[in-house]
Structures are given as C-alpha cells and as structure tokens.
Amino acid sequence: MRTAYCGQLNLSHVGLEVTLCGWVNKYRNFGKLIFVDLRDREGCIQVYFNSDAQKKTYVRAADLKQEFCIQLTGIVRSRPVSQINKNMSTGFIEIEAKFFLVLNVSNPLPLDIHQDNIEENRLKYRYLDLRRPIMFHNIQTRSRVMALTHRFMELEGLLNIDTPVLAKSTPEGARDYLVPSRLHINKYYALPQSPQMFKQLLMIAGIDRYYQITKCFRDEDLRSDRQPEFTQIDVEISFITAKKIRELMEFFICKLWKEILNVELEVFSQFSYAEVISRFGSDSPDLRNPIEMKDVSSIFQSLGNKLFICNAGCVDTIDTQVIVMNVPSGFKLTRNEIDKYSDYAKKSGIQQFLWMKIQMNDCKEITAIDGPIINLLNKNFLQLLMAQVKIENNDILFFGFNNDKNLSTTRMLSALRSKLGYDLNLVKQDSWKPLWIVDFPMFKKNTSGKLVSMHHMFTAPKDNDLICLKRNPELAVSEAYDIVINGCEVGSGSVRIHSYKLQQAMFDILGITRENQQKKFGCLMNALKYGAPPHAGIALGLDRLVMLLTKSNNIRDVIAFPKTTGAMDLMIDAPD
C-alpha cells in the first residue's frame, strides 16, 4: 500500500513519486493551499494540496480532519528556503499531493496526543497514547534491546529455552497469582514469580548455558518500577564463578548502552552490602549523588555520659548512633530550608537532627562556623571530626541521632540524602554510575523476628560453607550480587546451591519442615542428588533497563499495555 515511510524521506528523494500511509497529524487551510502533516511510525512530513494544480484532490482534502487514516500519492519537492523547518527531520522537503484515499475516519480524540495527559486517560486509551512519538520511541527502544539481547546471548553460546508459565506455588517472597485447574478440582497452578527452579533443573540436565526473555508475575504492592507482570532477561550458566558471570553481564550492559545511546560506560564500581548501607543508607544507591554518610558516634561519646544543651534541645551522647552527612555547598541553605529538612528526617525516624555550616580559607583552616551544635566546638572535637569527615569550604554537616539499635540510622537518612541531591542540583543528570553490590547477608529477620532469605533460598553461602551456615546463620555471607545503575536495581543474581545437604540445611534454617521441603521443592531436591553441577545465574529487569535507556520516569512508559499502581488494566477493564 505504500512505497516509503514518512519519516525516512529526505532531499535525495526530490522529484520521486511516493505513496505514503499514515494519520493526519495537523491540518491547516490557507485558502488556495491546504497543508497536512502526515504521520506514521517513522515521523512526519508536510503535504500540500494545491487548488490550481489538483482541483479535485484539493476539494476533497478540505474534508480531512485530525487523525483520519489516509493513503496518499504525491511528488517529493524541496521546500523554499524561507519555509525550511529544521525542527523536523523531513523539514527540508514536502509532498505535492496528487491523489489520496481516506482509509478510515476518526472521531475527536478523548486525549490530546500532542501533549502530556493525565495517567488515567493515557492508560484507558493506551492505543491512542502509543501514537505519541515519545511512546513509539520507547517501544521501539524496547524492541531493539530485546533483539540485541538475543544476538548477544547466542554469540556467547547460551540457548534460548522457554520454561512453563503454569507452574507450582513456592514461597519466593511475594504472593502468587493462582490459576484454578478445570480438570483437577480444588487444585491450582501458580504463575511463576521467576523461572528459578526450572533454570536450575536445566543446569542439572546438562544444558550448561541458558537464557530467555520471560514474563514473571508477582502479586505485590506496586510503585513506579514495579508491575504485577514484568519481563526479565533470565540467565543461568554451569561451571562458572560469581566473578565471571558478573564480567559477562557487565560486558552485556556496556554493549546495550553503546548500541542504544552511544555511551561508553565506565568500569562498574563494586561495594559490599555493608559498605553501601553505611555510606549511602541504601542497597540501591545513586552514585551520581556525592553526599555520603559517616558514623561519628565515637566522637560524640567522647564528650562523656551526659546531655548537652543546644538550640535544638537535649541530645544523649551515650548509646546513641550519630551519623553525619556532608552536603557540598550547603552553606547557602536558609534556616527555614534547614528546618524543613530536619522535619523530613524526623518523619523517617531520626530522633534528633542538628546541623553545622563551615567556611574555610585556601589553607583549609576553618574561618566561620554556624549552627546549633556550635557550643560543642572545642579544638579536640573539631580535630576528631575533620579526621573522619572530608570537609570543604561552604559545606553543611547534618547530624542524625538514633538510639534504637534495631533500626539503621543511615537507612533513615537515605531519603533525605536523595532529596538533598536533587534539591541542590548535586546529581549529574547526564551521567551514568553503574555498580555491583556483593557480600549480602544470607538472611535477614522479618517483622516477627524470623529468619528469611535476603535474596532467595537457593542462594549459596560463600565458599559453600555448610558448617558456618549451621553454626551461626545470621553471620553467613552469600554469593549474591546486584547491579544498580543510577539508583535503580536492574539485576540480581547469585551462585546457586548445588549440594543436596546444603540445600536441606538452608530449608531447615528457614523453618521449612522436611515434609514441606519435599512437598514444595521435591523435584529440585531429588535432582540435586544426581550430580548437579556448580552453577550461577542472574535476572535483569528488561523494563527497568529500557526505562533507564529512554530516561523515562516509570516502567509504565516502556510497556505497551501496563497496569495501574492498583494492578488494574483500565483499557480492557481487567480484572473483571
């Protein structure tokens, strides 16, 4: 029906007759000339109808309206110099219309595809929202990422194998979506939260190197980077170390950024879990933000077992964790702004919040200090503080106090760190800061004090140390690893347990009875008895990767037909 796409025409096509198909993007009637911007998935091109040259075509064109779907034949012409539009990729040319056919008319649109619209309307009329160029760009980028993934994985010798969607319910952290069986009354399939067991079984089967781009389903509370159904790039490889699989995935992500954005990513930083929590208060830190935290409890405890009085009130110096955040160029903050940040920190659980502004000369000598903490400023205190905290001229120091040993003070301050970074324009928006996080604890305690897996229950402890795992599970460190880019966790993986005894011990620690071990995981447990190889894997969030690559605000903008934060599909009115 067409010989070219609108957005692909250029000056080299001048004089050629072309047939185009698309939608009326804009319509302008100037009397003897009618101008239409014709749009297809590749872009827009200006078409003009001349009443003198093509009378019948011109008369019919007067009835065109926005979003009519048409087929048009015409001649590619170069625009007069005065009419060149450098804001369009086709702005140097236009089409002189000879004939057109209306393929379908359009009612007035319920939303304006030339501007932003409220989220509810965008999701209800998603098929119209996808006509917006930015949305097409996002979906096209997603397609490119998937194609690049397939090419990369095949070149690396991984086999693309799909695993079942109708599976068995297993305790993996989130709630399952259940599908009742018609043939087996009162029995249910579960939609997989991940293909975890299946890909491990593939390794035991000798497949050796596996991948797939797969749908996963989790019935959990949603946010901007979560959907009830999401897509992940799933990888599992036998006879590989954690270091080698990290190198492979780092190479893959660098290729994505190079191919899609023409950006050379720097070598990924690597931090332990304990380090990112202590320095940034988060296990998915945005390293573009230069603000770091430091535990200075010992400095305050050196003041003695007493309360000190300042403008902010009384603060206990003993048995209290004190975390300082050094905010570059924060001297300019007003007292009113500081008070707002103080309130923000206290809403996160911080019991007391103090500040200190510092000015220095070129010799790094302090010349001015301000803040409610000023009555503490003896020479010894300042020397101890400057020995632990890197302070520059015009910085402001924020001190957060917390005496609840069950709560992490740095985690409480993490949201404030992020807010300050954006409020003060400290985050370099055009930069990329990828990192690996390693050495996660094997377990954490849930709200009832029970041990649960930090990652999942198939993650191996470091060095496969069964004795350490049994003796003191709370101190066990896992062979898990996460990828974080600009504060967004885009991947998570681990070396897997390949020993029957070690997997059994893991289940025992988690309080899963031997009976339930067989009931829930009997297939995997039995398979581990038959020469299971060492293996490791990772899952990358495709939606999150594309969100970053397109600089979108949430993953709904990179999924063709997403759900709301309430897990509703407004377009098809599901669930019903």
UniProtKB/Swiss-Prot annotation:
The keyword Aminoacyl-tRNA synthetase applies. It holds the Pfam family tRNA-synt_2. It catalyses: tRNA(Asp) + L-aspartate + ATP = L-aspartyl-tRNA(Asp) + AMP + diphosphate. Residues 196-199 are annotated as: Aspartate. Keywords: Aminoacyl-tRNA synthetase, ATP-binding, Cytoplasm, Ligase, Nucleotide-binding, Protein biosynthesis. One of its GO terms (molecular function) is ATP binding. GO terms for cellular component: cytoplasm. One of its GO terms (biological process) is aspartyl-tRNA aminoacylation. Signal peptide: none annotated. InterPro entries: Aa-tRNA-synt_II, aa-tRNA-synth_II, aa-tRNA-synth_II/BPL/LPL, Asp-tRNA-ligase_1, Asp-tRNA-ligase_1_N, Asp/Asn-tRNA-synth_IIb, AspRS_core, GAD-like_sf. Homodimer. Belongs to the class-II aminoacyl-tRNA synthetase family. Type 1 subfamily. This is Aspartate--tRNA ligase. It comes from Blochmanniella floridana. The lineage of its organism: Bacteria, Pseudomonadati, Pseudomonadota, Gammaproteobacteria, Enterobacterales.
